[in-house]
Each structure stands twice: as C-alpha cells, then as structure tokens.
Amino acid sequence: MSVDLATVKRVARLARIAVSDQEAERMTSEINGILGFVEQLSEVNVDGVEPMTSVMPMTMKKREDVVADGDKAADIVANAPNSDRNFFVVPKVVE
C-alpha cells in the first residue's frame, strides 16, 4: 500500500492542517516509508507467540467499576469561553 501526493493533501485539508507542496511531497515519502515498515511487520510469522502487554510479568490492579458523575460539572466549565447548561459550546468546524 502506498499514498500519493493528492491523498496527503486531501488528508491535510480534512485535518485542517496547512501544508505546502514541498511539505506534502516530504510527507508522502515519509508516510510511504512507514507503510512499507508496517507491511514488513505483517509478514512476520507470529503463530504460537503469546501476546505480550509488558516485558515484566505482573498482574493488573483492579478496582470496582462504579459509575459516578463526579459532581464537578460547574467547576469544569467555569473557565470555558462559552458554555450552556454545563456543556462546552464550540464553533462548528465540520462541513
């Protein structure tokens, strides 16, 4: 898999990131290098290899999962430039 210059420019536009033509060309080669490495990783045979979460064997500490609102809504939106009924109000950015 590889990406072309048009794809990089399209993704930058969707992410609302200003990218010059020179930067887009550089990013195209960097992204293609990363994708090439990922393709190499997919070729590695990992049959029989147990997934690893840490290099040190340890058990995760667990706690009871309790649902709570924290009663901090007013404190959280206190410094927001614009809020409505304890919700952040932000300008529309998605077309």
Swiss-Prot record:
| UniProt EC number | 6.3.5.-
Q: Which UniProt keywords apply?
A: ATP-binding, Ligase, Nucleotide-binding, Protein biosynthesis
- Per the record, what are the reactions this protein catalyses? L-glutamyl-tRNA(Gln) + L-glutamine + ATP + H2O = L-glutaminyl-tRNA(Gln) + L-glutamate + ADP + phosphate + H(+); L-aspartyl-tRNA(Asn) + L-glutamine + ATP + H2O = L-asparaginyl-tRNA(Asn) + L-glutamate + ADP + phosphate + 2 H(+)
Query: Which GO molecular function annotation, any one, does this entry have?
Result: glutaminyl-tRNA synthase (glutamine-hydrolyzing) activity
Q: Which GO terms describe its biological process?
A: glutaminyl-tRNAGln biosynthesis via transamidation; regulation of translational fidelity; translation
Subunit arrangement?
Heterotrimer of A, B and C subunits.
Protein name, per record: Aspartyl/glutamyl-tRNA(Asn/Gln) amidotransferase subunit C
Query: What is the role of this chain?
Result: Allows the formation of correctly charged Asn-tRNA(Asn) or Gln-tRNA(Gln) through the transamidation of misacylated Asp-tRNA(Asn) or Glu-tRNA(Gln) in organisms which lack either or both of asparaginyl-tRNA or glutaminyl-tRNA synthetases. The reaction takes place in the presence of glutamine and ATP through an activated phospho-Asp-tRNA(Asn) or phospho-Glu-tRNA(Gln).
Q: Determine the domain of life of the protein's source.
A: Bacteria
- Give the species: Sinorhizobium medicae (strain WSM419) (Ensifer medicae)
